[in-house]
Structures are given as C-alpha cells and as structure tokens.
C-alpha cells in the first residue's frame, strides 16, 4: 500500500531546477505580457478586450506559476503531487484563455459564444478528469487538448475575414506548436 503513494522521479535535480527557474521567468514575462495586452485593449477602448486580455494573462500566469511550484518540490511529498495536478489542469485553463480574445473580440456574436462554450466545456471536462486521476484519463486529456486546440477550424473563414494576415499566421503557428507539445507530452 505504501508503494502506491511513491512517485518515481521523472526528472533529475538539474532538470527540475531549470524547469522551476525557466517557468518562474515565464511568470514574470506573463505578467508583463498581460499588462501590455490590457493597456493595448484599454487604449482601443475595448472593455471586452480588457476582460479578454485579463483572462488570457491570468491563465498564463497560473500555468507558469503552477509549473514553477510543481518543479520546486522534492519527489514523493504531497505538495509535489498536488502541484502536478494543478500543473496539468492549468494547461486546460491556458488553452481556454487563449480562445477568449478570439471568441469574444475577433468573432463575437453567436459563433464566438458557441466556440467559447465548447472550449470552456472541454476545459472543464479535462480539469475534472485530471483532478480525478492524471494517469487513468491521460488519453482523454490528450483528446481534450487537441479538440480544444483545433476547435477554431470551425470558424476559420470568419477568423480569416476579421484578422490580418499576421494574426492568422500567429494563430496557425500557435495551433501547430500546441499540437507538437501535446504529441511530445503524450
């Protein structure tokens, strides 16, 4: 029974240290990025943009903070196990947060709110499953990650019509990077 509580170290001490440091830097950069996005949205006079930027930035900060804390604890202590769950759940938050500006600012209307609801639902499902058992629902989590990441395809025409070329390019590159990350993780 005691062996069930033991988690084998997944990373060396130096890997953990580098992850904690780099993700800690990510927290600081996420704060700076969030401030820039909020200032830009406010200068555009967009209340929805300010809210969207705030949500996106907050979820990015949460992701990097949970990862920093996860990598900061020694293996086989309760805090590490708890922050591992938080770390995985925060991925769903960030993917959802990434959609908020696209769904509420770029798309808005019925299509935007529909996509918002679909991605939010998938995020909630993923968070619930990860909170129950990370290993048991790993494949389902992967499916949720990929569905969330590529759900925007259903609105690609409207996205293309409402964003400039660079915006569409960044969206596509972001989707590819999310997918590579999901495949490497899985």
Question: Where is each model-derived feature located?
Answer:
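Multi-pass alpha-helical transmembrane bundles in non-GPCR membrane proteins
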Residues: 1-186
